[in-house]
Swiss-Prot record:
This is Methyltransferase pytC. GO terms for molecular function: methyltransferase activity. Residues 1-28 are annotated as: Disordered. One of its GO terms (biological process) is methylation. Methyltransferase; part of the gene cluster that mediates the biosynthesis of pyranterreones, a family of antioxidative compounds. The first step of pyranonigrins biosynthesis is performed by the hybrid PKS-NRPS synthetase pytA that condenses 4 malonyl-CoA units ato the acetyl starter unit by the modular PKS of pytA. The acyl chain is then connected to an L-serine through the amide bond by the modular NRPS of pytA. A tetramic acid is formed and released from the PKS-NRPS pytA to give pyranterreone 5 with the help of the thioesterase pytI. Keywords: Methyltransferase, S-adenosyl-L-methionine, Transferase. It is an enzyme of class 2 (transferase). Its EC number is 2.1.1.-. Disruption phenotype: Abolishes the production of most pyranterreones, but accumulates pyranterreone 5. The gene is pytC. Pfam families: Methyltransf_23.
């Protein structure tokens, strides 16, 4: 078993002391009828196919947020769509939980010589247009995979809170990869911290993240898979395995221009996305009243706009190969 740890991010993110805080007022195919049916609650739209499997909305507001997250993660990876040592030419590629399909679309545009790029999701929210080598399917990856197509590369990103049995999912990835094929998992470690003590443990942002973890554990869908991903791919038989770790700030307080940009996007993610995070899980699972959730959401938005709180997430990428 070969496990490599790639170069760690810098020890600390340098703070731009001139970065201002902001006001919260300044803010981003053919299918069956059952698949196209949606649920509406909390003023938002949710998927109807295998309802409840994904606890967050899928409406236009959420789609815009997911596209922004794609840009954020791509920037964190220095404008790379993947880290696996893969030449996509002639390869079959799967994007698990494709969401709006933006990663698959960008892969198709960037690598027109890739033989096939498939994006699957519970929600049919992908565009009808796509590069010639890209197609989308509505499917539940937690069930037995109907598609028996062997892949050369499987990409799985931002699925925290969506999967009940991660080891089983990773075993299915292993089974559907060709020998020598690659699996890449990308997830944030969903416990916030600061390097200078500016994020109190009782902050609204920290309380929200803790509540999301507790709520997802109650429904059997871990909100923090990142710390366990390396172990799961080892147990599935992948070898070699490389672990990469990056830092994502919340806010425009870093001096580094790229981190400042990424932090600004993560700030928007909190300000615009907090309602989507908390609406269902905090009321239906944790038993909070709508008024209590509204107070939390307001506090999260206000803290995210402050540049004197230097909150950080770690972002983990696991790159693992199926042996020949």
């Amino acid at each position: 078993m070969t496990v490599r740890t790639a170069a760690e991010p810098p020890n600390r993110i340098e703070v731009d002391m001139d970065a201002p805080s902001l006001d919260t007022d300044s803010s981003c195919t053919s299918l069956s009828s059952s698949v196209q049916r949606y649920e509406y609650k909390h003023g938002r739209r949710y998927h109807g196919y295998h309802a409840g499997s994904y606890p967050f909305p899928n409406d236009k507001r959420e789609q815009d947020r997911l596209d922004m997250i794609h840009h954020l993660y791509t920037r964190i990876l220095n404008d790379r769509l993947f880290l696996a040592p893969l030449d996509p030419r002639g390869k079959a590629i799967l994007d698990i939980g494709t969401g709006t399909g933006i990663w698959a679309l960008h892969m198709g545009d960037a690598h027109p010589a890739a033989r096939l790029i498939v994006g699957n999701d519970l929600s049919p929210i992908q565009p009808s247009w796509a590069p010639a080598n890209v197609r989308f399917v509505v499917d539940d990856v937690e069930k037995d995979w109907v598609d028996r197509h062997p892949y050369d590369f499987i990409h799985c990103r931002y699925m925290a809170g969506s999967i009940k049995d991660w080891p089983r999912l990773i075993r299915q990835c292993y089974a559907h990869l060709r020998p020598g094929g690659w699996l890449e998992l990308q997830e944030s470690v969903n416990v916030m911290y600061s390097e200078d003590g500016t994020l109190p443990p009782d902050s609204f942002m920290a309380r929200m993240m803790h509540g999301l973890i507790v709520a997802c554990e109650k429904i059997g869908r871990t909100m923090d898979p990142a710390p366990s991903m390396e172990k799961w791919v080892q147990e599935a038989g992948f070898d070699p395995i490389t672990k990469h770790r990056f830092k994502i700030p919340v806010g425009s307080w870093p001096k580094d221009p790229r981190l400042k940009e990424c932090g600004s996007l993560m700030r928007v993610n909190f300000v615009e996305g907090v309602e989507a995070f908390t609406a269902s899980l905090f009321t239906e699972v944790l038993g909070w009243t709508p008024e209590e959730v509204a107070v939390l959401n307001t506090g999260v938005r206000e803290e995210a706009m402050r540049n004197d709180i230097h909150a950080i997430f770690d972002f983990v990428v696991i790159v693992a190969q199926k042996p020949y």
